[in-house]
Amino acid sequence: MIDQTAIIHDTAVVHESAVIGKGVEIGPFSVIGAEVEIGDNTWVSSHVVIKGPTKIGRGNKIFQHTSIGEDCQDKKYAGERTFLEIGDNNVFRENCTVHRGTIQDQSLTRIGSGNLFMVNVHVAHDCIIGDNCIFANNATLAGHVVIGDFVIFGGLSAIHQFGRVGSHAFVGGCAALNKDVPPYVMAAGNYAKPFGVNSEGLRRRGYTPEAISAVKRAYKEIFRSGKTIEEVLPVLTEMAQAEPAIQLYVDFLKDNERGIIRA
């Protein structure tokens, strides 16, 4: 179904089963496949390929030569029915690639809202990405990666499959992540190491000076006390009773399986 207000170039190919919302624009030579749903006021440039099953929300911008919803690159994939979901108001610049999930996980790749994917960013199968993140040019996410909210990835950075990055973390350019990065942490290097708290990012997002100070104290407990994760969790849990921002650390570390980056 194509809404009558949608603007579709004569050279674009749209499958009869696709659902195209109000005010959608689809540029020349783009291909919209079967079982694709594009939300209202989304703009699709020229030479874009979107395959289903894929659901895209409202107000997204998808630039030329981007591939959305393609089969994954996992060698175990054998044509199973898997999915991709994208929220609202995301920007995918030129040459981005986003793959659907696999049955070995939840059969789903999911991207939240308000994210910016710069040129050549790759999001592999089964990735889960939160809201308001920025991925600079050539950032690469392997399969099954989980990214929180307000995370920034520098250009040419990469993360190992099944890796996790907590909310408000900052990953420097050319970083290679082979372990998890807890919330609020700045990570850089190959392999990446922690370099303090993303204080500037927290200030921009309205964190109080008191909250930022508490986050820094928690950071020292995690990375400078010499304690294991099991030993530091009770300390952080107690700190979180006085400062709710610390709860992000607690929740993240409780779910840790791969280990976290270390100095």
UniProtKB/Swiss-Prot annotation:
It holds the Pfam family Acetyltransf_11. Pathway: Glycolipid biosynthesis; lipid IV(A) biosynthesis; lipid IV(A) from (3R)-3-hydroxytetradecanoyl-[acyl-carrier-protein] and UDP-N-acetyl-alpha-D-glucosamine: step 1/6. SUPFAM superfamilies: Trimeric LpxA-like enzymes (SSF51161). Its EC number is 2.3.1.129. InterPro entries: Acetyltransf_C (IPR029098), Acetyltransf_C_sf (IPR037157), Hexapep (IPR001451), Lipid_A_LpxA (IPR010137), Trimer_LpxA-like_sf (IPR011004). GO terms for biological process: lipid A biosynthetic process. Signal peptide: none annotated. The keyword Transferase applies. It is found in: Cytoplasm. One of its GO terms (cellular component) is cytoplasm. It catalyses: a (3R)-hydroxyacyl-[ACP] + UDP-N-acetyl-alpha-D-glucosamine = a UDP-3-O-[(3R)-3-hydroxyacyl]-N-acetyl-alpha-D-glucosamine + holo-[ACP]. It is an enzyme of class 2 (transferase). Keywords: Acyltransferase, Cytoplasm, Lipid A biosynthesis, Lipid biosynthesis, Lipid metabolism, Repeat, Transferase. GO terms for molecular function: acyl-[acyl-carrier-protein]-UDP-N-acetylglucosamine O-acyltransferase activity. The keyword Transmembrane does not apply. Homotrimer. Involved in the biosynthesis of lipid A, a phosphorylated glycolipid that anchors the lipopolysaccharide to the outer membrane of the cell. Belongs to the transferase hexapeptide repeat family. LpxA subfamily. NCBIfam families: lipid_A_lpxA, PRK05289.1. This is Acyl-[acyl-carrier-protein]--UDP-N-acetylglucosamine O-acyltransferase. It comes from Aeromonas hydrophila subsp. hydrophila (strain ATCC 7966 / DSM 30187 / BCRC 13018 / CCUG 14551 / JCM 1027 / KCTC 2358 / NCIMB 9240 / NCTC 8049). The lineage of its organism: Bacteria, Pseudomonadati, Pseudomonadota, Gammaproteobacteria, Aeromonadales.
